[in-house]
A protein has these predicted regions:
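N-terminal membrane-anchoring alpha-helices
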Residues: 1-5
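A catalytic-pocket lid/entrance helix-loop region that shapes and gates access to the active site
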Residues: 124-152
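Active-site loop/oxyanion-hole signature of alpha/beta-hydrolase fold enzymes
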Residues: 54-95, 111
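Conserved HGGG/HGGXW glycine-rich cap/lid loop of the alpha/beta-hydrolase fold
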Residues: 16-62
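Conserved catalytic-core motifs of eukaryotic protein kinase domains, centered on the activation segment
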Residues: 36-38, 63-69, 130
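A short loop-to-beta-strand scaffold at the N-terminal edge of the catalytic core in hydrolase folds
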Residues: 7-17
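Conserved hydrolase catalytic core segment
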Residues: 90-132
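Conserved serine/cysteine hydrolase catalytic core
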Residues: 165-213
Length: 213
């Protein structure tokens, strides 16, 4: 499913569906098991009119985990490198979910010629993080519980029930959910989210933006 590309010494998965020259890049929010499988129904529907591309960040889905910085500009750099290596060319319509709004806004600010439009799916805007109360102890406990296999005793709590997945895909999803529940990359994402929000501009260049809750 998709292709593996090497970025900064880590394997990243890039999934492409559809042949239209108009390209939508789907960016997932934090903490899901596999963006490719989670967005399956969306990508299948959109691929009838667009080329749909899903990049699984390190720590997600079929991609490797990573202990590298999760600074928003580093994450953006990895996404752009993965697209380049998969021979996916812009400009792009970028559809981002939840916390991935930070990456898409940073992308539009730094590389405006690559961004044709932004689509926000339940966006978390930079200002939303100002009063965020972080609970790193909870994340750390969950991380180590995942590492020692404790969370395997509660499988139904840690993956999204997706009726569009085949039995084989559902089994893959469960395995990925166990493997990637709280990887290092997601732990580092949680620690840097407030700092990343400060690096994203509160105002952006004029562009078509659609937001859905």
């Amino acid at each position: 499913m998709g292709q593996q590309v090497l970025v900064n010494g880590h394997q990243m998965k890039v999934y492409v569906e559809g042949n239209d020259p108009e390209t939508i890049v789907l960016l997932s929010g934090a903490g899901i098991a596999s963006p490719i499988l989670d967005f399956k129904e969306v990508s299948e529907s959109l691929s009838k009119r667009y080329k749909v591309v899903i990049v699984e960040r390190v720590g997600y889905g079929y991609s490797d985990d990573s202990n590298y910085s999760r600074d928003v500009m580093e994450v953006l750099s990895e996404t752009r490198q993965a697209l380049s290596q998969a021979n996916v060319k812009g400009p792009f319509i970028i559809s981002s979910h939840s916390t991935a709004s930070l990456e898409s806004l940073a992308w539009q600010k730094k590389y405006p010629d690559e961004v044709k439009a932004l689509i926000g799916l339940d966006w978390v805007l930079p200002s939303s993080y100002e009063d965020l109360k972080e609970n790193q102890t909870l994340f750390t406990v969950a991380y180590w519980s995942s590492k020692i296999g404790l969370l395997r005793y509660f499988p139904e709590s840690f993956y999204i029930k997706n009726p569009t997945l085949t039995e084989n895909e559902l089994e893959q999803y469960k395995l990925l959910a166990y493997k990637q529940l709280i990887p290092q990359a997601i732990l580092h994402e949680s620690r840097l989210v407030k700092e990343n929000a400060k690096k994203v501009p509160s105002s952006i260049n004029p562009i078509l933006i659609l937001s859905f809750l």
